[in-house]
């Protein structure tokens, strides 16, 4: 982690947290408690914290969900930087010339069908009343990926 950018707050016009004095990271359930303790200690000392807590962190925090922790995760459960303070974020790059290729699913049709079947089975069994089934997509980007975000943040006219 080299830094974290927020397009709004706490500073007007965007906020950048750069050059963390330390990075707190938990990749496994056993690393979660020490990471949370380190985060709280840094907060108590008056440091700024910026980073993320992954969705899968819930599996480590709730014993009932622990067996459902996805295997082969490729991102930490916790990744948090300790910073001295925020600074104004630099202007975003011009999005002209950035192109994104066609989106393609990163799951096979068989994997998708199996996930839909499992979701329907959970609902039918009364284990849940809805499922937000998502799956990863990929696309090739030509140009600066940060400039690509400018396109997605731009207001869109209502139809």
Regions found by a protein language model. Name each.
Residues 1-159:
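Extended alpha-helical targeting/anchoring segments
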């Amino acid at each position: 982690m080299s830094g974290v950018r927020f397009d709004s707050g706490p500073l007007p016009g965007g906020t950048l947290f750069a050059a963390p004095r330390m990075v707190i990271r938990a990749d496994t359930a056993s690393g979660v408690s020490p990471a949370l303790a380190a985060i709280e200690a840094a907060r108590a000392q008056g440091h700024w914290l910026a980073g993320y807590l992954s969705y899968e962190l819930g599996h480590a925090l709730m014993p009932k969900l622990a067996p459902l922790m996805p295997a082969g995760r490729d991102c930490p459960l916790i990744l948090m930087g300790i910073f001295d303070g925020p600074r104004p974020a630099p202007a975003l790059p011009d999005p002209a010339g950035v192109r994104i290729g066609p989106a393609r699913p990163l799951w096979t049709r068989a994997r998708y069908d199996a996930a839909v079947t499992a979701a329907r089975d959970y609902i039918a069994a009364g284990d849940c009343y809805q499922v937000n089934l998502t799956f990863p997509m990929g696309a090739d980007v030509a140009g600066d990926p940060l400039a690509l975000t400018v396109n997605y943040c731009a207001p869109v006219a209502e139809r």
